[in-house]
């Protein structure tokens, strides 16, 4: 039997000024699901990094769009960020991504790759697929003992 979930899908222009819309939407969804404040802040950073990577690298000078899909499950939130722009070989890049030596001065940190390192560190799971463009699937599980819910959580089941 397939696991039940609800889906929210958004498309925005791949421009820096629209990344905040995705971040705010994700924070609202995560809050209603019952995620703790710190987990929401981590997810905000991760989704910002994923979208910023698309804005900076996927379309170069062209204007494309970012597709964001939120999968709301009983125990987790899955966030997919996708583009149809220029792809890159994640396997070769992953070997160059963190961890970083904390004893080295900040001037010696690489300029590229920190976003993927942050996403990988802040989320519970990350998968990256690249065919026609790039798709980043990030997962964060709800830690029930830390739930700070000010209302009723979103149900992933229809009540009718």
From Swiss-Prot:
Signal sequence, start to end: none
Keyword Phosphoprotein among record annotations: no
InterPro entries: Anti-sigma-factor_SerPK, HATPase_C_sf, RsbW
Family: Belongs to the anti-sigma-factor family.
EC annotation from Swiss-Prot or TrEMBL: 2.7.11.1
Catalytic activity: L-seryl-[protein] + ATP = O-phospho-L-seryl-[protein] + ADP + H(+); L-threonyl-[protein] + ATP = O-phospho-L-threonyl-[protein] + ADP + H(+)
UniProt protein name: Serine-protein kinase RsbW
Species, as recorded: Bacillus cereus (strain G9842)
Alphabetical list of NCBIfam families matching this protein: PRK04069.1, rsbW_low_gc
UniProt KW Kinase keyword: yes
Keywords, ordered alphabetically: ATP-binding, Kinase, Nucleotide-binding, Serine/threonine-protein kinase, Transferase
Enzyme class: transferase
Task of the protein: Negative regulator of sigma-B activity. Phosphorylates and inactivates its specific antagonist protein, RsbV. Upon phosphorylation of RsbV, RsbW is released and binds to sigma-B, thereby blocking its ability to form an RNA polymerase holoenzyme (E-sigma-B).
GO MF, any single term: protein serine kinase activity
């Amino acid at each position: 039997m397939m696991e039940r979930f609800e889906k929210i899908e958004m498309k925005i222009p791949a421009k820096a000024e629209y990344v905040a819309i995705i971040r705010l939407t994700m924070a609202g969804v995560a809050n209603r699901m019952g995620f703790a404040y710190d987990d929401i802040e981590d997810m905000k950073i991760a989704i910002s990094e994923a979208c910023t990577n698309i804005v900076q690298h996927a379309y170069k000078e062209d204007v494309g769009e970012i597709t964001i899909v939120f999968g709301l499950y009983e125990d987790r939130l899955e966030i997919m960020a996708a583009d149809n722009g220029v792809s890159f070989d994640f396997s070769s890049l992953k070997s160059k991504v963190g961890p970083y030596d904390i004893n080295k001065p900040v001037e010696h940190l690489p300029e590229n790759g920190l976003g993927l390192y942050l996403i990988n560190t802040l989320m519970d799971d990350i998968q990256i697929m690249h065919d026609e463009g790039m798709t980043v699937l990030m997962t964060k599980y709800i830690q029930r003992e830390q739930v700070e819910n000010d209302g009723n959580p979103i149900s992933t089941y229809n009540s009718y």
